[in-house]
A protein has these predicted regions:
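Short, motif-level signal for alpha-helix interfacial/capping segments enriched in acidic residues
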Residues: 1-7, 135-140
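Conserved non-catalytic scaffold segment of RNase H-like nuclease domains
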Residues: 2-104, 147-151
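Short, glycine/charged-enriched secondary-structure capping and boundary segments
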Residues: 32-35, 111-115
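Active-site-proximal helix-loop-helix substrate-binding element of RNase H-like nuclease domains
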Residues: 55-58, 64-67, 71, 125-165
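Secondary-structure boundary motif
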Residues: 90, 94, 115-118, 173
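Acidic, Mg2+-coordinating catalytic module of metal-dependent nucleases/exonucleases
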Residues: 96-102, 107-112, 142-174
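A short alpha->loop->secondary-structure connector
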Residues: 113-125
Length: 174
């Protein structure tokens, strides 16, 4: 597959990118989104727990140990799939949204919107698409730095989205 063209971040007036992160029931074909967090270019954030659809039964205790979300919590406090899809479209519609785990997040969004019977009105792209070749090796380091500076817990969707947006901002100065 050909490499995607890099879009430089060096314009000082350029808005911060919208970012998104998804926590899931595990990995693999039967996994599904359980928490979706995002940060808009103006800094507004959102986060929703997703109530699993009745046929979404896959649950990986290893993944649960990382994100700390129990299935019982989702069943009691999660929002219905259609409501989550509608809210994502309301909040993110018209934006290109960036993910540092696009290879996982894209299929999980597809699962969510397919179950909701709707389509996203935003575009999800890999965060690396924003970077020049010389910046690619620095993203992980600056992502860790962003978590430290923000003093937030990892593997919660809105925190991860905030840290990614901050890391991308830090890369502007590199």
């Amino acid at each position: 597959m050909p490499a995607l063209p890099a879009v430089p971040l060096d314009a000082a007036a350029q808005a911060l990118p919208a970012t998104l992160d998804i926590e899931a029931s595990g990995f693999g074909r039967d996994s599904y989104p359980i928490e979706i967090g995002w940060v808009l270019p103006d800094g507004r954030t959102g986060c929703l727990l997703v109530k699993p659809a009745a046929h979404w039964t896959h649950w990986d205790e290893g993944a649960a140990a990382l994100h700390g979300i129990r299935r019982e919590t989702l069943l009691a406090h999660g929002r219905p799939v259609a409501e989550v899809a509608a809210r994502l479209n309301d909040e993110l519609g018209g934006h290109t949204v960036y993910s540092d785990a696009w290879g996982h997040d894209y299929p999980w969004l597809a699962v969510l919107f397919e179950e909701a019977g709707s389509a996203p009105r935003f575009r999800l792209e890999p965060a690396t698409r924003l970077l020049r070749d010389t910046q690619l090796g620095q993203l992980d380091t600056l992502h860790r730095q962003a978590f430290d500076e923000l003093a937030v817990e990892r593997h919660r969707a809105s925190n991860d989205a905030r840290a990614l947006q901050r890391a991308l901002r830090l890369l502007r100065d590199v």
